[in-house]
Each structure stands twice: as C-alpha cells, then as structure tokens.
Regions:
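Classical Sec-dependent N-terminal signal peptides that target proteins to the secretory pathway
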Residues: 1-23
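Amphipathic alpha-helical repeat scaffolds of TPR domains
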Residues: 25-40, 65-86, 112-132, 163-166
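Short coil/turn linker motifs that delimit alpha-helical repeat modules in TPR/alpha-solenoid proteins
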Residues: 26, 44-47, 64-66, 94, ...
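Alpha-helical junction/boundary sensor with strong preference for TPR arrays
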Residues: 41, 55, 61-62, 102, ...
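Helix-turn-helix repeat elements of alpha-solenoid scaffolds
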Residues: 42-56, 90-103, 137-140
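Short solvent-exposed coil/turn linkers within tandem alpha-helical repeat scaffolds
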Residues: 61-68, 105-118, 150-162
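Terminal, low-structured helical/coil segments at or just beyond the last alpha-helical repeat
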Residues: 136-173
Length: 173
C-alpha cells in the first residue's frame, strides 16, 4: 500500500464518522422544522394542504424517526377535519392514503392513546365514507371500535359514532 492510499484511508476513518453524525443532525433539524409546520394548529385550519405537505416532508426526511407516527396521524386528521376532499369525493386515492396512514399509526405506534385516536378516526372514515368508497380493506370495524373505546384520546369520537350508528355495537357483539 502506498503512502497516498494509506493517508486517504486514515482521512476517511477520521472524517466519515463526523460527516455521518453531521448529516444525522441535519436530518433531525429538518424533521423538526417540518414537524413544527405540520403540527401548527392555526396553519392546519387556514392552509390544510400546506400543513399536510409539511407532514409528508417530515415523513420523507426521516422515515425512521421514533416519533414517525405523529406526522402520519396529523396528516390524516388534517385531511379528515380541515379539508373537504373526502366529502366531495374528489379522490379515492386520498381516502386510501388516509386509511393507510391511520393503519400505519395503529400498527407502529407504541402509544395506546395514539392507537385509540387513529382507530376512532379510521372507524369514522369507514362509516362516513363507506358509500362513496365501499369498504377499503375488509372489516376493521370491531377492532377499531374496541381500540377507540380503550383510551380517552379516541373514546369521545368512538362513543359519538356508536350513538350515531346504533347497529355498530350489535355488529361487533
């Protein structure tokens, strides 16, 4: 091995960990910036598409972030609560994307509260929009009902849905 190759190897061994560490810091900073925009409640109400786009960017920037369920959940809530895209039936793709995002939260979150909230909103989308989009992925009604009632974060919406759709409880009994 010649001296230039040896020097290059030493330089790589010394510098690469610093470069990798710096890039991870950059990723974390970018994630926090996009997460801040995504979770801004006044922006959600005034410019829901912009807030949802920021949620997508947070997911894109750092898909392995331990808190990745947060942008998926907020992205879904923004679509359901602050846009009329699902009501107008503008796009089956938006419904499917929202449903899949809520499913990711349910499947991947460690938080019982987040699972409960995501389940109640998935139940909501399935019940409210089933005529427009049919059933999307089999029947998650009963498991969503159970999870929705399991924690205070999803309980209120789930109870409202049970009162509105009286057969729901019978269907899952």
């Amino acid at each position: 091995m010649n001296i230039k190759s040896l020097m290059a190897l030493i330089l790589q061994l010394v510098c690469l960990p610093a470069i990798a560490n710096n890039s991870q810091e950059t990723v974390e900073k970018e994630y926090q910036i996009y997460w801040g925009i995504c979770s801004n409640t006044s922006l959600m109400q005034s410019y829901p598409q912009k807030a949802r786009k920021a949620c997508n960017k947070a997911i894109e920037v750092d898909p392995n972030n331990p808190d990745i369920s947060n942008p998926y959940l907020l992205k879904s809530l923004i679509t359901i609560m602050f846009t009329d895209e699902l009501k107008k039936g503008q796009s089956k793709t938006i419904f499917e994307s929202t449903y899949k995002d809520l499913t990711k939260v349910i499947d991947n979150s460690d938080s019982v509260g987040q699972k409960s909230q995501a389940s109640s909103y998935r139940l909501f989308t399935e019940l409210i929009f089933k005529k427009k989009y049919k059933k999307y992925l089999g029947s998650n009604l009963c498991s969503d009902l159970e999870r929705g009632l399991n924690h205070k974060m999803g309980r209120d919406l789930t109870q409202i849905l049970m009162a509105t759709y009286k057969n729901l409880k019978k269907e899952c009994a």
